[in-house]
UniProtKB/Swiss-Prot annotation:
Pfam families named in the record: Pkinase (PF00069)
Species per Swiss-Prot/TrEMBL record: Mycosarcoma maydis
GO BP, sorted A to Z: mitotic G2 DNA damage checkpoint signaling
Enzyme Commission identifier(s): 2.7.11.1
Residue ranges of domain Protein kinase in the record: 18-328
Family label: Belongs to the protein kinase superfamily. CAMK Ser/Thr protein kinase family. NIM1 subfamily.
Keyword line: ATP-binding, Kinase, Nucleotide-binding, Nucleus, Serine/threonine-protein kinase, Transferase
Catalytic activity as recorded in UniProt: L-seryl-[protein] + ATP = O-phospho-L-seryl-[protein] + ADP + H(+); L-threonyl-[protein] + ATP = O-phospho-L-threonyl-[protein] + ADP + H(+)
Reported modifications of this chain: Phosphorylated.
Keyword RNA-binding: no
Protein name: Serine/threonine-protein kinase CHK1
């Protein structure tokens, strides 16, 4: 595999014996890559976070070198099962004195290593630098942090928006979140950016707290200092972060309370904790508890949430108080005595069942499960039953309108030209909404049952054809996620294209019976209708699927028009010239979510069909044959909001009718 290069022709170097192989996220100053080190006994696959020191037109503010230095110093000393492990850090393309036109580094030329393996690699690289001082002159200048890979992906990628997860799952992950936070604070550190985007899963489904870029040391040798400066994401920050001094523990307690709320109901309670938010104002008066989704929250959990999100920090519950709360102390069959997942396959099954019942994933249903679904759908006279959608009765009709449309959004949220019963409190923005309007509840239940029925197959299938447990990062949890949702027709396209996308922790994906060209055109049309900035590029045989220059490594501006990447690119018709390569295409997109936060990522349309069948036939397409795979990969933003955008794409009738499985 070719080592990727930046738009300046500079390359990304080996880092502490790790070789960069795949871009997996990021934006602005930083990008995150997957990296491999086959000789490592503990982490053969890792993540490398690269913070560029190179000037870029899209970077409006200079890099905060002191903050970077603090992030490395703090994260490198944190060792806990629920904290993403820091393996090491090096700088490349820099000079500790700023000589030779290079940027001045923050590590003063010295690599940071925290494990025996990374220490050995650091010493080896040090010898190489002594023997060849100019060996890194053509590397992308920046800080390279080697981190544990969150092989299970984002936790909230597996939680249905406006639905949430069952109480035991929320309790399991909240216990792990609190364990990690208690440890962090025991070291005198406050995270200050607890949100879904910074909650990853390891290969066994356990939670890992990530990203210490906004952390601060607030306690040292028993002495505590107050902090200043608002930071984090508005829906999750504490109300006292308003420019005045605040304490370190209460702000993380508040943010973890909002995260718990989001796990239970699939939405944040407000846009921001200020008087500008009608929801937060209603929360302070107590009126908000009358409206969905608050009544859906179990009473003990609600009791804890109220204590964690008390507007007055002095009256807010502490971490110690949370641990004594009756909801926190409830038994949980998913967890070992040491606080880890005791059955990764069961955990994957429960997460997927929630997505199936909410309608956020589509699973190919056949055999007994399909027959059961048909029986549920029919009355005794053989006529189809009218199965109502599981929607709040207070939800306005506008829910079927695009949630990304600004005009419709105000009405759908209930804050424009709509009020609650009797002209009272407007409808909360987090009221429930159906995922796929054309789907019915009986089929959703059948899909959930089908996921359970496939568990018996997993132990034998996982080691058989199509499931390589020896793949880097493969585990029972990650393989179960794919096995339970995989459709049988996939075996007909095995070996075509690049399979690493098919077997990944990303659940914002679907297999389609339409051609890649058709789906590409439809997705771009949906994004245009939603006013989502987007640009696409063809992917050809001569390119690595996720590493070619089209990423414009440090570009964080608006998506730009791209050119064909090879001779296989061709227009697909329509008003806009669409580019589709022999392997498919990639769409880069950027928008603002409904909480006014940046949402950025890419959509991959991978061609699975034979070379001579890349377009839709005039005859009826084979409904069971997958012609393309679509994967939406979030780069930056709230995972719940990313899944909402995925939902919007899938709702398009022309796309929905081609979806075989997700």
């Amino acid at each position: 595999m070719t080592i990727p290069k930046s738009s300046t022709g500079q390359s990304y170097p080996p880092v502490l014996d790790y070789r960069i192989v795949q871009l997996i996220g990021g934006g602005g100053f930083s990008k995150v890559f997957r990296a491999v080190n086959p000789s490592s006994e503990s982490h053969s696959v890792a993540a490398i976070k690269v913070i560029s020191y190179a000037p870029n037109r899209s970077n409006k503010y200079p890099i905060d070198r002191r903050a970077l230095q603090k992030e490395v110093q703090v994260h490198s000393i944190l060792k806990h099962p629920n904290v993403l492990e820091f393996l090491g850090a090096v700088e490349r393309g820099v000079d500790k004195n700023g000589n030779a036109g290079k940027e001045k580094g923050i590590l003063m030329g010295e690599a940071v290593a925290t494990t025996k393996e990374s220490i050995r690699a650091r010493d080896k690289e040090r010898q190489q630098m002594l023997s060849s001082p100019s060996h890194d002159q053509n590397y992308v200048p920046g800080l390279y942090m080697v981190l544990e890979l969150g092989a299970g992906g984002d936790l909230f990628d597996k939680i249905a928006p406006d639905y949430g997860v069952e109480e035991d799952l929320a309790h399991f992950y909240f216990q792990q979140l609190l364990a990690g936070l208690e440890y962090i604070h025991s070291q005198g550190v406050t995270h200050r950016d607890i949100k879904p985007e910074n909650m990853l899963l390891d290969a066994e489904g356990n939670l890992k707290i990530a990203d210490f870029g906004l952390c601060s040391v607030y306690k040292y040798k028993g002495k505590e200092r107050e902090l200043t400066g608002a930071c984090g994401s508005l829906p999750y920050i504490a109300p006292e972060m308003n420019g005045k001094p605040y304490r370190g523990e209460p702000v993380d307690v508040w943010s973890s309370g909002v995260v718990l709320f989001a796990m239970l109901v699939g939405s944040t309670p407000w846009d921001e904790p200020t008087s500008r938010s009608p929801e937060y104002s209603a929360y302070r008066t107590g009126k908000l508890f009358e409206y969905d989704p608050w009544p859906r929250i179990p009473q003990d959990a609600l009791s804890l949430l109220k204590k964690m999100m008390h507007p007055t920090p002095e009256k807010r519950i502490t971490f110690e108080g949370i641990r004594r709360h009756r909801w926190f102390k409830r038994a949980n069959d998913l967890m070992t005595q040491k606080g880890k997942c005791n059955d990764p396959v069961n955990l994957a099954e429960k997460l997927l069942q929630g997505l199936a019942v909410s309608g956020d994933i589509i699973v190919e249903v056949n055999g007994a499960a399909a027959a059961a679904a048909r029986r549920l759908d029919l009355h005794s006279d053989g006529q189809r039953a009218q199965v109502p959608e599981n929607v709040s009765l207070t939800q306005p009709d506008a829910i079927l309108t695009s949630s990304f449309d600004l005009a419709a959004r105000a009405v759908a949220r209930g804050w424009a030209d709509d009020t609650g019963p009797g002209g009272g409190l407007p409808l909360p923005s987090s009221t429930a909404m159906p995922a796929f309007a054309s789907d019915d509840m009986s089929r959703r239940l059948a899909m959930s049952q089908h996921i359970s029925s496939r568990r018996a197959e997993f132990s034998t299938t996982a080691s058989g054809s199509g499931y390589d447990m020896a793949l880097p990062g493969a585990s029972q949890f990650t393989q179960a996620l794919n096995h339970f949702t995989q459709f049988e027709a996939l075996t007909h396209v095995a070996g075509t294209g690049s399979s690493h996308l098919r077997f990944s922790p990303h659940l914002t994906r679907f297999f389609s019976s339409a051609s890649a060209a058709t789906i590409l055109a439809l997705i771009i049309d949906v994004l245009d209708r939603l006013a989502v900035l987007n640009a696409h590029q063809a992917i050809g045989d001569q390119e690595e699927l996720e590493l070619e220059e089209a990423y414009n490594f440090m570009a964080d501006g608006e998506p730009e028009t791209t050119v064909p990447s090879d001779d296989s690119s061709r227009p697909t018709g329509g008003s806009k010239r669409l580019l589709i390569g022999s392997r498919g295409a990639r769409i880069r997109l950027k928008t603002m979510d409904r909480r006014k936060c940046v949402l950025r990522g890419e959509v991959y349309v991978e061609n699975l069909a034979a070379p001579d069948s890349t377009s839709d036939s005039a005859s009826a397409p084979d409904r069971n044959a997958a012609k393309c795979l679509v994967v939406m990969k979030k780069g930056k933003g709230d995972p719940l909001e990313w899944r909402r955008l995925f939902r919007e794409v899938c709702r398009r009738p022309e796309i929905m009718q081609t979806i075989i499985s997700t």
